[in-house]
Every structure is written in C-alpha cells, then in structure tokens.
Amino acid sequence: MAFARRLLRGPLSGPLLGRRGVCAGAMAPPRRFVLELPDCTLAHFALGADAPGDADAPDPRLAALLGPPERSYSLCVPVTPDAGCGARVRAARLHQRLLHQLRRGPFQRCQLLRLLCYCPGGQAGGAQQGFLLRDPLDDPDTRQALLELLGACQEAPRPHLGEFEADPRGQLWQRLWEVQDGRRLQVGCAQVVPVPEPPLHPVVPDLPSSVVFPDREAARAVLEECTSFIPEARAVLDLVDQCPKQIQKGKFQVVAIEGLDATGKTTVTQSVADSLKAVLLKSPPSCIGQWRKIFDDEPTIIRRAFYSLGNYIVASEIAKESAKSPVIVDRYWHSTATYAIATEVSGGLQHLPPAHHPVYQWPEDLLKPDLILLLTVSPEERLQRLQGRGMEKTREEAELEANSVFRQKVEMSYQRMENPGCHVVDASPSREKVLQTVLSLIQNSFSEP
C-alpha cells in the first residue's frame, strides 16, 4: 500500500517513461476520446505512442483543461464492441450511479464534463461513456475519493480511472489506476496526443443499439434485461407481447402531432380531435403511463426502450381505432428518436448525424401515420409558457429550459426526420388561428390525389 501511495503522490519523471507517448510496459492499443467543453465544442485526443496524432502540435484547449495548475481525472465505463444487451444495460446503470456520486461530497467543488471513449474507424458498439473531473484545488482528497470509488466497484464492468498531468517539458500524460486486492496501483501511463475530429460523431454508430432502436425486438431485449431490478419492466413487456406484430392501419386518417414541451401540443391535439370527431391517443399510452416516472429516472438506454415499446402499444391502438374513425396521436416515434439523438450526441448542432442518415428513418415494423405535424414557437414564447405551467418537469423538460443548444438539437433532429417527415406549423398565434392552420393542412393533405 505504501508503494501505491508513493506512486499516487509522485511526480511524472523520466525513468517512468518508455518510448514516445507510453510508459514502459503499457502498450495497450490507442483509443480515442472526445471531450465536451463548456461552450459545447468538442476536443478529440488519443493515448499512446501509436496514436495518429501530433504531440508537437498541442491543442491549447486540452492543455487548459488537463494540465496544471489544476488537476483532472477521467472515469470511463468499459464496454467491448461485441458486448450484448445485458452488458450495455449494466454499463449504463454504472455510469448513472457514478454521475450521482460525482455530484456529492468532495467532488462538488470540481467541474464535471462529459467524456466519451471510442475506437477509431466508426466501429459500432465501441463507445464508452465517462466523465472528466476537473479539481480547481488539486486536493489529494479528490484523488483519494476517486480511488475509493473505484475500489467500491467490485462487479463488472469496473470503471477505468485516469489521472492527467504534465511532464517538465509541458507534454500531457495520463496515468491509469486500478484497485487490486485492496491495493491501489498504477497500471499504465500514456501520452495525450490531439487527433482530428472524425467525419461522424463517434456515438452515432451506437445509436441503434442504445437509444434509437430500429425495431420492436431491439427495444424489447433491453427491458428484458431489466426485469430483475425493475418489476414494472415485466408488466410493460407483457402488454407489448399482447400487441400483434403484423398490423394495418384502418381506412380513416391518422395524424401525429409533435412538438417541444409548451408549444401548445396538448391543446391543439384535443381541439383537432374534437373538430374531426377523432379518437385521441397519446404516447406513451395510459396503460403504461403510470410507470413513466420510474423509467424517466433510469439511464437513457432503459428510458428509451420504455418509450419505444410504448410506441408499439400505441400502434396497436391506432390500428384498431382507425378502422372506425380518424385518429390523432399526441407524440409518436419522432419524439422518442429526436430526444434520444439530442441527448446522446454531445456538442452542438454541427455534430448531429447528417441529413438523410439512417437514424432519421422510421422503423419498418412500426405503423406509420398518414401525416405528422410539428408545432414550433419561439424560444422566448416557449419559456414564457413553461414558466406559467407550474408543473413538475421531466429531466428532458428541465434540459430544454436550461440548455438552448439541446433545444436546437431536438428541433433540428425533428426537421431531419424522414419517411415520413414533419410538416412544420407555427404555433405562436392564437389557439383559434393555430387550430385553423392545422385543420387546413389535414384537409389539404387528404384531399390530394
């Protein structure tokens, strides 16, 4: 233990280093990292001698965040590229537990940033979620608390703890720590090398397996892994399994109405349903709405599986009701997908998947509406309406209110949805005017040959 403490306190010095960019004995394949900075820009770097970067051309943003006089640490939850659904669920739950712990105790004085570890080349399944913790005081208590946190994680997956510091030449390095048999040991050290930003955000290849599920079975597999610790997951699965997989829309029109919170969506959907003598359905449906708060408190992969399966339950209801009358749906698949994309893709608008990317395509096994309307209002109008509602906010409602970049990513994702796309409706005018506009769009859509 004394040896571990000496390593923990000791400076990074010459004898510790091997060939360029890596400590002796630590020749792991280079991985890349993307760090979301406070201004929503992204900084990419790699570790190791063979990393395809340029150590002689440092990124000043990395030097400011990882170098002295403050102290920075990385904490990543490992997931192998070939990991199954159960492993991804366990990793997501550990990531969320770590997030809660990093907001308490000695960590409260630290700056917490979003960090993603990934394999180069756009390989699906290789993204690892994590954090960068920036201690402004370089307090040994922070390091000790992190090592204790690492030691408390006895079950797989165990997080990887890295510590950043600069050598006498000003080059950045990362030490990697593990806790083995109660001993805290340094197990690796590699140079931090800036690398170019890849053409596609590295989390995008993982979206279909983690949050934007391409079909019913993919979402179902996630909740199946949750039944041992979320009893309500079994109830949701039982309801989904009662819904036929092969369904068809009836002869009457089906219109889905989408929009951010406080765009007047609830009022418009009810008014349109009354005007058309239509059945009004909501996603998630009432049969699982009682469990919404439970799943909203879970990691994104579980939360999105819940909402995705809710869409399939709604689809079954649509098929039944559209045989008898028109159907208006308050939110549907587009809502589930857009919030997931905006949440998972770090950075700004420019980092979203490009237009026409497959992630924006409607699932082939989910019943499609005839028309999708997207209600929009100005940010100022939406904020004013939110403040007047006085209702408890979901995590995403609070994020929309506090984070303009997140709101813009949600709106852009809505606009990039295809097959079917969204018809944008300005919901800023009076309720009567908005209702008239919506009814006119519906009438024109169904009167076209």
UniProtKB/Swiss-Prot annotation:
Key words of the record: ATP-binding, Coiled coil, Kinase, Mitochondrion, Nucleotide-binding, Pyrimidine biosynthesis, Transferase, Transit peptide
Gene Ontology cellular component list: cytoplasm; mitochondrion; nucleoplasm
Keyword flag Membrane: no
Catalytic activity: CMP + ATP = CDP + ADP; dCMP + ATP = dCDP + ADP; a 2'-deoxyribonucleoside 5'-diphosphate + ATP = a 2'-deoxyribonucleoside 5'-triphosphate + ADP; a ribonucleoside 5'-diphosphate + ATP = a ribonucleoside 5'-triphosphate + ADP
Residues binding ATP, per UniProt: G259, L260, D261, A262, T263, G264, K265, T266
Disulfide bonds: none
Chain segment of the transit peptide: 1-98
EC number in record: 2.7.4.14, 2.7.4.6
GO molecular function: (d)CMP kinase activity; ATP binding; CMP kinase activity; dCMP kinase activity; dTMP kinase activity; nucleoside diphosphate kinase activity; UMP kinase activity
Annotated tissue distribution: High levels are observed in myeloid, lymphoid and mesenchymal tissues.
Factors inducing expression: By interferon-alpha. IRF1 is crucial for the transcriptional activation of CMPK2.
Biological process (GO), any one: dTTP biosynthetic process
Subcellular location: Mitochondrion
Coiled coil: 380-412
Disease: Basal ganglia calcification, idiopathic, 10, autosomal recessive: A form of basal ganglia calcification, a genetically heterogeneous condition characterized by symmetric calcification in the basal ganglia and other brain regions. Affected individuals can either be asymptomatic or show a wide spectrum of neuropsychiatric symptoms, including parkinsonism, dystonia, tremor, ataxia, dementia, psychosis, seizures, and chronic headache. Serum levels of calcium, phosphate, alkaline phosphatase and parathyroid hormone are normal.
Similarity section: Belongs to the thymidylate kinase family.
Task performed by this protein: Mitochondrial nucleotide monophosphate kinase needed for salvage dNTP synthesis that mediates immunomodulatory and antiviral activities through IFN-dependent and IFN-independent pathways. Restricts the replication of multiple viruses including flaviviruses or coronaviruses. Together with viperin/RSAD2 and ddhCTP, suppresses the replication of several coronaviruses through inhibition of the viral RNA-dependent RNA polymerase activities. Concerning flaviviruses, restricts RNA translation when localized to the mitochondria independently of its kinase activity.
Protein name, UniProt field: UMP-CMP kinase 2, mitochondrial
Source lineage: Eukaryota, Metazoa, Chordata, Craniata, Vertebrata
